[in-house]
Amino acid sequence: MEKNKQALLLQAIEDVFAFSFSKYAKYIIQDRALPDLRDGLKPVQRRILYGMYQMGLKPTSPYKKSARAVGEIMGKYHPHGDASIYDAIVRMSQAWKNNLTTISIHGNNGSIDGDNAAAMRYTEARLSPYGFELLKDIEKQLVPFVNNFDDSEVEPSVLPTLLPNLFINGTSGIAAGYATNIAPHNVGELLDGLSYRIENPDCDLKAILKIVKGPDFPTGGLVYFEQELANIYQTGKGKFVIQAKYETNTAFGQNQIVITEIPYETVKANIVKQIEELISDNKLSALESVIDSSDRSGIRIIINHKDFLSADKIMAFLFKHTQLQVNFNLNNTVIANRCPVRVGLLAYFDQFLAFAHELIINSAKYDLALANKRLEIIKGLIKAVSMIDEIIRLIRRATDKQDAKTKLIDKYAFTLNQAEAIVSLRLYQLTNTDIKVLFAEQKELEQTIQTAERLIAKPQARNQLLQAQFFQYKKQFNQPRRAQIVGLIEKQKVQDSDFIEHKEVGLLISHDGIYFKFEPEQLAKHLVEFKSEQDQLIFGGVVQNSDYFFMVTSLGNIITVPIYKTLSNTKTKMNELLAKKPILMEDEKLVLAGIVNPDKMEQQLLVLTSQCGMVKRVELSKVINTKQIKSSCCMALRERDKLVNAFVQTKGEPKLVCLVSSSNSFATFLAEEIPIISNKGIGVKGIKLKAEEKVRFAMPLQDNDALVVINSDGGVYNFEVVELAVASRMSVGKKLIPKTKTPVSCFAANKHSEIIGHRGKNGSDLFTLNELNRLPKSTVSQMRLFKWS
């Protein structure tokens, strides 16, 4: 116990955390998330390739279960869970994620639609030809090997590849304090660029960029950049914009846009879903339908559209609102000399070529050592064959193998290796050896030694070998460029208003929040057909599809909605008007709906009246919000109060405002007496009310108007403005109709006004004021009446 106590280390907890996290962060940076500059691989990818190589899973070998490979790799090299290993194997096999796949999977390895791969127990895997090439000459020990996690195995610290894999397939990852996002490039362009750099070591970046034209994504697309390409590849950091490639078509009289290539790292099914949501939400009325007709031959997303917008404009809208356009933020952060650094294209080429020279030197040294050792033996065998009889007698007289070796060394001056080779041969092999074959092998070995020595000594020889190897790789792995480099992107401010169908539409809006948009010629028909015993219309008319309408609610809120974003030809509740965006609270009613007129809005005021008699005016331009569909306050209300009326007043008109209470009191006063205050103000008293008395109606009055009052038994009362007792604000209302009569409708009208009379289930009729006066009371009593125009 005392011994254990002495072994304890007392240390502050913050120091323990700091040390542990810094150690962990260093591990994450160096050995997990960032790729090595030389082979372009993260540790898990390198271990997968090496583990499968050790299992003999060559491109020509039979496939083996992925689960077996995962178990081997996890048990020997990467003890971080089977899921991470299998996910990496799957990604390394996906052609839409890599320009050249390093692993070949037999079975379901996922799809560009985001489908998961089959479980590892169902799929089979092996190295692809490209992946196998990354491991070429691994057995020569050309690179340092390190112990695995439990020191039971060794693994390469880097693969001895002469392929610029870092830029061929690209990669991405996030470490502690560092991130990387390297774009894939065309293998042929990279190999040509490396060859050009070898021939012209002093060339500048612009010369290389004539060969390496930019990223080449496996899914194709159009590539733009926001700054000069040279700046991006000089610093190793910048932004590319990738757009889908499309073509236009007409089939069976239907205008079509056909998407044939999508941006890198996007999911096709998600793109189709985004377009479907735009259609269902009526975000762009030109869109009609989308069909995914993709198959094994390639991507084919068909978008049917109306012809009032061009295909280019529709695609501009889709680029803004879907993943048909994405940004690729280039960040070439890699591990070089065990440190994270950001490299440009020239820096990468130079460091990769330096690594390639190192590999060639190590390979030449390895070949040289083997050739010298074999040449020593061949020379001994040639010497032995020339004195075959003496050698045979010596071996037969020897007491054992060691005695024979000693005598060969002492008597004939053979080296130890030569003597070992001679005594290891059976006598019949020794006697039957063809000296011509030995001389031919000697010559071949001497040439090998000469070549190896030249490669070790002369950089020019190594460069020639590299260029020949790059040429061979280009023949073996080159692919046509998929992504089209367009150039600098022109920043265009695309607004939703650019995509509106400019036409007239009919529009009806009711007190209960029923919204109906239809063809303008059907207005009269829908007015007559409007049926509701409890609801009533508050707006109707022919408007422009590009207009905005605003609504004032009983809770003192105002909402502005663009008409072009709403659905047509169906009666819709206001909370279903915009998908996933309720705009009215429960029991919230509409008291006013109108069209926003930007040219007149600065001269317009919104006059608001609550049932408790509060009135206020607010500048319309300060409460209208056309940038977003959002309910905002236009009048603060006390508890148990609600808005009963709102109307728009042009400054200076109308002159009078009339409030009608639940006890038939009519208070008329000048509109100028109502103060203009902020949207969150409560307002001022407009009429003196008795206990339990409420304001039921409020309306503006012009000089030539008549105040029309309809009571419950169908009586119609018309009062000229001069008959009203105009008083000051906050006065007691005047009794204009008998106390026994209950007003059910009240509005200002003139001889040109039209009145709508709702007849319940029988529909609605339009009347002039004079016609209404001539109707029998029994007919009027069955109607809910209000002014139409």
Swiss-Prot record:
Residues 34-499 form the Topo IIA-type catalytic domain. Pfam families: DNA_gyraseA_C, DNA_topoisoIV. GO terms for molecular function: ATP binding; DNA binding; DNA negative supercoiling activity. It is an enzyme of class 5 (isomerase). CDD domains: TOP4c. The keyword Membrane applies. GO terms for biological process: DNA topological change. The record marks 121 as: Transition state stabilizer. Keywords: Cell membrane, DNA-binding, Isomerase, Membrane, Topoisomerase. The record marks 42, 78, 80, 91, 97 as: Interaction with DNA. Its EC number is 5.6.2.2. The active site is at 122 (o-(5'-phospho-dna)-tyrosine intermediate). SUPFAM superfamilies: GyrA/ParC C-terminal domain-like (SSF101904), Type II DNA topoisomerase (SSF56719). It is a peripheral membrane protein. GO terms for cellular component: chromosome; cytoplasm; DNA topoisomerase type II (double strand cut, ATP-hydrolyzing) complex; plasma membrane. Heterotetramer composed of ParC and ParE. Topoisomerase IV is essential for chromosome segregation. It relaxes supercoiled DNA. Performs the decatenation events required during the replication of a circular DNA molecule. NCBIfam families: parC_Gpos, PRK05561.1. PANTHER family: DNA GYRASE/TOPOISOMERASE SUBUNIT A, DNA TOPOISOMERASE 4 SUBUNIT A. This is DNA topoisomerase 4 subunit A. The lineage of its organism: Bacteria, Bacillati, Mycoplasmatota, Mycoplasmoidales, Mycoplasmoidaceae.
